[in-house]
Amino acid sequence: MKEHYNMSKRILIMGLPGAGKTTLADKLRTYLETAGIIVDWFNADEIRKQFNDWDFSHAGRIRQSLRMFDLSKTSDADFVICDFVAPLVEMRNNYKADWTIWVDSIKKGRYEDTNKAFAEPAIYDFRIPEQD
């Protein structure tokens, strides 16, 4: 049986911590809502707070990506924006984004373990190379 989920378009905004993902997500949400488009926005840090779940092991990162996808499936919005680091290819694949925006404005983030784990995406729709 084929999995059924909503028709919301999923936008993944990913990149290293401090690159500007949340700032971009907020601006994109505001822009779309001003145009009358219904948007849900899920920020990974805020979602982790709800689950009291700050596990950054490989399994913890995968769990978070699946959680973000599950949340996106519950939305009736036109667009669902999720901003999270998504350092692993598997995490990006789990989210099943319609569009991926890579915020590539910094070369090193705040957390060395995340810098080591981060695999630059080979596939993305938009790349933001600098903060502005």
Predicted regions, residues:
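Phosphate-binding P-loop
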Residues: K2-S8
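Hydrophobic anchor at the beta1->P-loop junction of P-loop NTPases
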Residues: I13
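Glycine-rich phosphate-binding loop used to anchor ATP phosphates in small-molecule kinases
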Residues: H58-Y111
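Small-molecule kinase domains that catalyze NTP-dependent phosphoryl transfer to phosphate-bearing small molecules
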Residues: N93-N94, V103-D132
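Conserved lysine of the Walker
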Residues: K21
